Amino acid sequence: MKKLFLWLTLLIVFIAVLAYSIVFSKFGNELIASYIENKVNNPQQNIKFKVTNFRLRVDSLDFNAVINENSNISVNGALSIWNRWVDLKYDIKITDLSILNNLINQNLKSELFTNGVFKGDYQSAIIQGFSNIANSETKYNLVLKDFKIKDILLELKNAKIDELLNFMNKPHYLNGDLTINANIRNIDNNNLDGKLIANISKGQLENDVINKEFNQTFSSKINIDGDIEASFLGKNAEIKTQLLTSIGNLILEKTLVDLEKDRVVSDYKFEVKNLQKLESVLGRK
């Protein structure tokens, strides 16, 4: 019985040493890097993903990869396999997001640079970083619970609206700058809690695109500035909207949205100081 116990102990130790040598050794790292490359490249036709550095140890990770020779992903820092926590820094530079559309099941365009930290364990973690999305100055802080986003703190400053539309692969309806400040402490649709403030400045409609997409006949330039304030509580949202345009002003003091029932109730006021400015919109005098 003692010999059997001894042999079982030796077998367990051998398996543990073998697993360590495979996973955390140079040979094992090369196998993992090759697996990652194949996993990304095989389903794609327009991606050449190459892992240039992969070093995984029990307490650290260094990872660098190149996509199509002009985009880079870098992740490095400390981790604990046994305690399941990480303290990692990331730096991502993608020059053309459209190459990832099949991989992420989203239809995106433009470029994306972002860097930050990912810190925490499997129960609670944060992702905090910066981005230049749509030529903006953006800060974000995400709180994760059980690997699901719970809280969002976002500061998006002076994003170019036309570049945001291009980012989402949408027609170029509008030019201008967009600033958003959002503090959502719970994104559960049944128990929302937070606020969002958005500002549009220097906005101008692209008449050619509007006319084509919506079968309109706009001819005069339409400038837009606007402010939106939204409060979220439970399953409801309350929104105040003010849009100031060169043809008139649209003001919605109180819009109530029932997110569960998809129901909207709102007041509105549309002010026009010069009816002649509506001629190009209405198509008649």
Predicted region positions:
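Residues in intrinsically disordered, low-complexity segments of regulatory proteins
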Residues: 6, 81-84
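A residue-level signal for beta-strand positions that form part of recognition/binding surfaces
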Residues: 151
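Hydrophobic lipid-interacting interfaces of membrane-associated proteins
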Residues: 33-37, 41, 45, 52-82, ...
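N-terminal type II signal-anchor transmembrane helix
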Residues: 1-41
